[in-house]
Amino acid sequence: MVNVEAIRKVQRAEGPATIMAIGTSTPPNAVDQSEYPDYYYFGSPTASTRPSSRRSFKRMCEKSMIKKRYMYLTETYWKRIQMFVPTWLLPLKARQDMVVVEVPKLGKEVQPKAIKGMGQPKSKINPLVFCTTSGVDMPGADYQLTKVFGLPPSVKRLMMYQQGCFAGGTVLRLAKDLAENNKGARVLVVCSEITAVTFRGPSDTHLDSLVGQALFGDGAAALIVGADPVPGVENPMFELVSAGQTILPDSDGAIDGHLREVGLTFHLLKVVPGLISKNIEKSLVEAFEPLGISDWNSLFWIAHPGGPAILDPGGDQTRPEARESCGNQACFSVSMATCQVFVCSSFSTRCEGSPKEEGLKTTGEGIEWGVLFGFGPGLTVETVVLHSLPTH
């Protein structure tokens, strides 16, 4: 007689899911944030806005902590479009024609980096999780990536469109379940974002759009997530201990995105930083109370910054190091679902050995336990508990 429980036991991994490798990539086109308002954004002959709007946008760029933004849209391409139609009115078809092709292409660039870090051939990859806020299509970017990267046609795929800035946590939550419930699985997670679907010129009637234009750039990131690493071959960076998602109370309409003929439009309320500050400790308590941890200053933090106000609303709930870790990505523009992965990658890079950080004993910059946060439409919060591993 077949024993279902015995079958399930064989199918499941023995240990926790781990982040085994990370790869990141950005488009070659880079723009200094200090030059972006005058020379790139307001340089269009169709951009006639009030001086107050210009000053507001410059102030947003200055406070963003971003030093350089990477963009698929080059200045030449952007100005050529502006000769015919303001970017506020650029039709969805034109945006889709760009991102449907370029999102999988940018995603393809990061896969070899992640697979090299895993130390296993790409034939070990299964399943594939692809996430993007940039465009929608059928078959999706997961299908296109499978074809261009030469993955087996039998690879299990999951496509996530239109999730927003919390999705960096979502993909880890899903990858954790996939890795722990499928023995031997090596989950390839790819996030690829190109802001052509949201990019538009200034408008005096849509001032909340300026926030997204000031913050978001383009980039792609890939992770390999798996359990029971092969000794001497795979060297995991973090263990994924737990993962949760919640919708914050009284947050309806705080962050919205709507796909319209003019592309993906953003609507942000000023109360977002306050809502997160007010509720973030509850998420921390729920995640860390089972571990006996209540000192948030003892954790390393990885979060989607979404602008400095998100993690520094004037409160005591977040530690200075949280803002510092997020700043590693903010220096190179914020990229929706990929942001948290970029920060994870920067942790790994620093632990590998610049003189300043020599001697760090864990992948969490010497700290054992950490938290990864994602904030986005809903207002939705993803919380992932990370356990760092020895660097040697």
Swiss-Prot record:
Question: Sorted alphabetically, which Pfam families does this protein's record hold?
Answer: Chal_sti_synt_C (PF02797), Chal_sti_synt_N (PF00195)
Q: Name one GO molecular function term.
A: naringenin-chalcone synthase activity
| This enzyme's EC code(s) | 2.3.1.74
Record's catalysed reaction(s): (E)-4-coumaroyl-CoA + 3 malonyl-CoA + 3 H(+) = 2',4,4',6'-tetrahydroxychalcone + 3 CO2 + 4 CoA
What biological-process GO terms show up in the record? flavonoid biosynthetic process; polyketide biosynthetic process
EC main class here is: transferase
Give the residue range of the signal peptide.
none
Keywords, A to Z, come to:
Acyltransferase, Flavonoid biosynthesis, Transferase
What pathway or pathways are given for this protein in its record?
Secondary metabolite biosynthesis; flavonoid biosynthesis
Instruction: Tell me the active site.
Output: C165
Report the sequence similarity comment from the record: Belongs to the thiolase-like superfamily. Chalcone/stilbene synthases family.
- What does this chain do? The primary product of this enzyme is 4,2',4',6'-tetrahydroxychalcone (also termed naringenin-chalcone or chalcone) which can under specific conditions spontaneously isomerize into naringenin.
Q: What is this protein called?
A: Chalcone synthase
Give the organism the record lists.
Persea americana
The major lineage groups are:
Eukaryota, Viridiplantae, Streptophyta, Embryophyta, Tracheophyta
